[in-house]
Regions:
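Surface-exposed extracellular loop regions of Gram-negative outer-membrane beta-barrel proteins
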Residues: 313-338
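Short loop/turn segments that connect beta-strands within beta-propeller blades
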Residues: 286-288, 326-329, 369-371, 420-422
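Short beta-strand motif characteristic of blades in beta-propeller domains
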Residues: 93-94, 266-267, 271-275, 313-317, ...
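Loop/turn segments within WD40 beta-propeller blades
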Residues: 307-310, 348-354
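Surface loop/turn motifs at the tips and blade-to-blade linkers of beta-strand repeat domains
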Residues: 220-221, 255-256, 295-299, 336-342, ...
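Beta-sheet repeat architectures centered on beta-propellers
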Residues: 1-97, 149, 159, 174-180, ...
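Disordered, low-complexity "stalk" and linker segments at domain junctions of extracellular
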Residues: 1-36, 42-45, 50-270, 276-277, ...
């Protein structure tokens, strides 16, 4: 009498014939947790919050004052906490919700009703458009003092102390120490919406033996259109630091025809990265409002998404991927990788820690350092991948070291779990990632849990579900390989 002894249970490998599957591999492994090598069902999700609308695709859990607030967005967003340690304002920065945005706890959690964030500001400080007018209004030149040819610029400064690029320079005038200059005609507002401007800083040119620099004169309120300067030349303070600190690409289509910056990502040394069209952009270190043009690099292909992959920035495109590496935005190097693995969906790209994973036409691709690998090769053929997992629709999430993917067939949603650490239990399927389907989600680094936005097809508001947050088991299915026995 024939019998079978099944000791280990592992994942699936559709590429391999059911008769040739290795020990423990199955034809089906659905809703099952195989980390311990035994059949254990995954549990259902638990609902932990209700959002303020049905259509929600972005979520960020903001911990403030010992309480967690769900920040919700209509679109998929990239949210980053500020790079400054112990930030007194508890600022967040994000892209994907229109022009790049930011806010402190005061804006995010403002009193009132409705969804968080309650308010926000535009990321970046605009330059004043009007040059100041200047004239000498007191003091005389008796011909015995050194004359200086000088002009003035001024900058806008936010309530957070962020400084923007300068105005056009005023007409040059000639003065000597002891004379007072009246500076007038300065802008008291900007045409940009959602700004947080509070003050202006005024600088005066000072010509040395080799160069001419603008040096600090004074700071005045935003509402001040006219002021005076009677500083002697040797009393001028620091050189203007913000000459090239322009805002990131925004909704000004005349300047940025490829659209606003997307994909906000935190790199080492306080540098932020983002992209617009084919252009990858970097911020000044620890100054996320400052994005000099000199720190922007144009690639050959349109960028789809970006993520950290170990110590380098991985740049997924519609064709060949790239990596960017460096510790200073002035010296970033960008290298095109030798792998034609396009990213089919920006939401499939996930930072897994040591590597980034995304959906390509051939399977799940992993990028780490300067290496790129089709991780599902040997498990799923490219043809099976396209036919069964619809990679152009995949939304990816990180959960406890595993890649969780949801796809859409055109009529139904499905999901899978992939462990990039490999092994025979690397790939399993999930019947449904959320009660309805996941519109988006957020992996909270504080607890390593995955929070999903569940869509209510009945018209109700979206809900936040904790992945496998309940104690109720799902129905698991495991189908073994085919066993072929000799005729009796």
């Amino acid at each position: 009498m024939a019998y079978f002894k099944l000791v280990n249970f592992n994942g699936i490998a559709p590429q391999v014939s059911p008769r040739l599957l290795g020990e423990g591999l199955g034809q089906t492994a659905n809703n099952t947790d195989l980390d311990r090598g035994v059949l254990t069902p995954i549990t259902s999700n638990s609902t932990i919050a209700t959002l303020n609308a049905q259509a929600r695709a972005g979520l960020y859990r903001y911990d403030f004052g010992g309480q967690v607030y769900n920040l919700e967005f209509t679109n998929a967003v990239n949210v980053q906490p500020g790079p400054v340690a112990d930030d007194a304002f508890d600022r967040l920065y994000w892209t994907g919700a229109g022009f790049p945005q930011m806010g402190s706890s005061t804006q995010l959690l403002a009193s009132g009703s409705g969804a968080y964030p309650r308010s926000f500001f535009r990321l970046g400080i605009p330059a004043p458009t009007s040059a100041a007018s200047t004239s000498i209004t007191s003091g005389t030149d008796d011909g015995t003092q050194t004359q200086y040819s000088t002009s003035y610029v001024y900058t806008f400064v936010s309530a957070f102390g962020e400084e923007g690029p300068p105005s056009p320079a005023s007409t040059v005038l000639t003065k000597v120490d002891g004379q007072t200059v009246t500076i007038s005609g300065m802008d008291t507002a900007t045409s940009k919406s959602n700004t947080n401007l509070a003050n202006k800083r005024i600088y005066r040119s000072n010509t040395g033996s080799n160069t001419t620099n603008f040096q600090f004169v004074k700071e005045v309120s935003l509402a001040t259109a006219s002021t005076t300067d009677n500083l002697n030349n040797d009393a001028l303070a620091e050189i203007i630091p913000s000459t090239y600190w322009i805002a990131p690409p925004d909704d000004d289509t005349s300047t940025y025809p490829n659209g606003q910056m997307l994909g906000l990502t935190a790199m080492a040394n306080g540098i932020f990265a983002g992209f617009s069209g084919k252009r990858i952009c970097f911020s000044e270190p620890f100054l996320p409002h400052a994005w000099p043009v000199a720190y922007r690099i144009t690639l050959e292909e349109e960028i789809v998404s970006i993520a950290m992959a170990g110590q380098v920035l991985f740049i997924a495109t519609k064709g060949t991927p790239y990596i960017a590496a460096g510790t200073d935005p002035q010296s970033m190097s960008v290298v095109r990788m030798e792998a034609a693995q396009a990213c089919l969906n920006k939401e499939s790209l996930v930072d897994m820690g040591d590597l980034a994973i995304y959906a390509s036409p051939d399977g799940l691709v992993g990028a780490s350092g300067n290496e790129i690998t089709v991780l599902t090769a040997g498990l799923i053929t490219p043809k099976q991948w396209q036919a069964q997992f619809y990679p152009s629709t995949i939304k990816g999430f990180l959960w406890q070291g595993k890649y969780i993917g949801q796809y859409y067939t055109g009529s139904a949603y499905g999901a899978f779990m992939f462990d990039p650490r490999g092994g025979k239990n690397a790939f399993t399927t999930i019947s449904s990632l959320a009660t309805g389907h996941a519109q988006g989600g957020f992996t909270d680094p504080d607890d390593n849990e995955l929070y999903l936005i569940d869509y209510d097809s009945g018209g109700g508001n979206a809900q936040v579900e904790l992945f496998q947050g309940s104690t109720t088991n799902t129905t698991q299915t495991f189908k073994t390989s085919q066993f072929v026995l000799p005729r009796p």
